[in-house]
Amino acid sequence: MHIVTLTYKVPNDEVDRHLEAHMAWLKEGYAAGTFLAAGRRVPRTGGMIFAAGGRDELAAMIKRDPFNVNGVADYTIAQVNITSTADGLEKLKG
C-alpha cells in the first residue's frame, strides 16, 4: 500500500479552481481499484490518498492529476507494509 501526500503550492482559491477536475480524477482511481481512501489535511494545506497497487502505476496516475498538471500541488509517495488491521480493513494488508 502507498500513502500519497499532497502539499498545496498555491492559495486555496487557486486549488478550488481545479477541485472539480481533481475529484473526477479521484473517481477514476477508485473505479480502477487503485485508490482506497482520500481526504484533505487539516488545516487545509493539501491532502492524502491511500492507494493499492504498484508504485510505477501510481506515479503514472499522479502525472495525470489536474492538481499536478496545473502546478497546484507537490506529491510524496510512501510505501507502507500493513501487517495488521481492524476487522473489515484486511484489503490494506500486503
Where are the regions that the model predicts?
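Conserved, structured core segments of small domains
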Residues: 1-94
